[in-house]
């Protein structure tokens, strides 16, 4: 698999872009997660960044990527509404893995947003989408631009939701490369990796949380619920960071 030129690929018609990505994804599917990271660092353009929500399985991708690129910027979009356990988990992992953590936030504070818009997460799908745009999408776009990102690593997995079930290892998003090294992992592989490397799940895992985001849009799992139903009141799965 040869090196990719981002500007040349972006200049291609959509059909030719898709064909080029299909070809390389056919080969990436047969590599291990570690080999995918190594291939990306050798063949995709820098600057490289890694995003993390510091959710349930976050330690896996953080460890996997930083073993090969210790100083890679780790982007966190902090909404100001994360669980106290999440903030402590961020501190613990940042110290343990010596992360180059880069925190980006909305232009206005949570209090200012509530004064101006009310509690957007209580205003149906439209309110949730506006909340996500203000607190996640816009800060992430700003982060990618500020860090000059051309290749973006993320820890999504197909098993997590129906909307992620068809995601490829490598894609173009926001005009940059996006590589998902553990996209085909199942829960067992996540557990094995964490155990092998002395890493922990998010602290709320033991309290019955399968997915962790903001306090007001995250629910503990109950019998009969899918993982998707534990977020955003079951109205949607994605926060917008990994869409488009």
UniProtKB/Swiss-Prot annotation:
GO cellular component: cytoplasm
Functional pathway: Sulfur metabolism; hydrogen sulfide biosynthesis; sulfite from sulfate: step 3/3
Record EC number: 1.8.4.8
UniProt record, GO biological process: hydrogen sulfide biosynthetic process; sulfate assimilation, phosphoadenylyl sulfate reduction by phosphoadenylyl-sulfate reductase (thioredoxin)
Pfam families in alphabetical order: PAPS_reduct
InterPro entries (UniProt xref): PAPS/APS_Rdtase, PAPS_reduct_dom, PAPS_reductase_CysH, Rossmann-like_a/b/a_fold
Compartment list: Cytoplasm
GO molecular function: phosphoadenylyl-sulfate reductase (thioredoxin) activity
Keyword annotations from UniProtKB, A to Z: Cytoplasm, Oxidoreductase
Active site, UniProt feature: 239
Catalytic reaction annotation: [thioredoxin]-disulfide + sulfite + adenosine 3',5'-bisphosphate + 2 H(+) = [thioredoxin]-dithiol + 3'-phosphoadenylyl sulfate
Superkingdom field: Bacteria
EC class (word): oxidoreductase
SUPFAM superfamilies: Adenine nucleotide alpha hydrolases-like
Family membership noted in the UniProt record: Belongs to the PAPS reductase family. CysH subfamily.
HAMAP family, sorted: CysH
Function: Catalyzes the formation of sulfite from phosphoadenosine 5'-phosphosulfate (PAPS) using thioredoxin as an electron donor.
Name by which UniProt lists this protein: Phosphoadenosine 5'-phosphosulfate reductase
Taxonomic source organism: Yersinia pseudotuberculosis serotype O:1b (strain IP 31758)
Gene for this chain: cysH
């Amino acid at each position: 698999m040869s090196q990719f030129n981002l500007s040349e690929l972006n200049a291609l018609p959509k059909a030719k872009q898709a064909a080029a990505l299909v070809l390389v994804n056919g080969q990436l599917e047969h590599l291990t997660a570690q080999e995918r990271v190594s291939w990306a660092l050798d063949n995709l353009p820098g600057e490289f960044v890694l995003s993390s929500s510091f959710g349930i399985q976050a330690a896996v991708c953080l460890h996997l990527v930083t073993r090969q690129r210790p100083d890679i910027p780790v982007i966190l979009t902090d909404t100001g509404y994360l669980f106290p356990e999440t903030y402590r988990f961020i501190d613990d992992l940042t110290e343990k893995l010596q992360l180059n953590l880069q925190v980006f936030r909305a232009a206005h504070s949570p209090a200012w947003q509530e004064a101006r818009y009310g509690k957007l997460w209580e205003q149906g799908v439209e309110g949730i989408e506006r909340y996500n745009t203000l607190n996640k999408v816009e800060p992430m776009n700003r982060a990618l631009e500020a860090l000059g990102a051309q290749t973006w690593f993320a820890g999504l997995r197909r098993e997590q939701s129906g909307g992620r079930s068809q995601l490829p290892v490598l894609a173009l998003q926001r005009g940059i490369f996006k590589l998902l090294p553990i996209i085909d992992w199942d829960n067992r592989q996540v557990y094995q990796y964490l155990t092998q490397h002395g890493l922990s799940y998010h602290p709320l895992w033991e309290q019955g949380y399968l997915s962790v985001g903001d306090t007001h849009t995250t629910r503990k799992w109950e019998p009969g619920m899918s993982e998707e139903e534990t977020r955003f009141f079951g109205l949607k799965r994605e926060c917008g960071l990994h869409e488009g």
